[in-house]
Amino acid sequence: MSASSDFYRLTHKKFLYNITHIDNIPSIIQNGIMSFDDIKHMSHHSIAMNDVQLRRDSVLIPGGDRLHSYANLYFAFHNPMLYKRQNIAEDLCILAFSCDVLDIKNCVVSDRNAAASLAKFYSAEEGIRNLDFDKIFAQFWIHDDPYEQSNHKAIKCAEILVPHCIPYDYVVAACVVSQNAEQRLRNAGFDREVSINAKVFYR
């Protein structure tokens, strides 16, 4: 059984997600979602936090390459990264990718934010059987115990990592916060289904 079919069997979910700036859409249409290393010399509007990128720069994937040489998606779009960027919601879109991405050669998954000190990395096939999807897809990650909250926050950001690039062909749909954002997305050339849902962006 493939990693994507295992994922659907265990979660009944079909999509994986990337949160990006609408200005990046023309590049994504042409080049796909690219790794940090592959895109750093190109014009790109990053929404990543500098301290997070510094941590990611030092992470090595066991048996693989640098974390920054992998393009990444999330299992859950409703996560701490989106929460932290709610102030620029009008500039963001959430891209939904087919879970078939999990079947791309050398795909790796992390059981939490890949830059977290406790992160474990697995092949896609093995990882799907080891991730805590109850916590990944939980609506909230706030806990009375600070350690449990920190741990759950990292788990919410479990990642799918693909060497270098995830082609645009895997993109199925997008979600934005408003009609204005939808128009910007269309003007950027996006040609897939678009939904508008302000609540997704904590509005």
What does each model-found stretch correspond to?
Residues 1-72, 78-203:
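Active-site-proximal loop/hinge segments that shape catalytic or ion-binding/gating pockets
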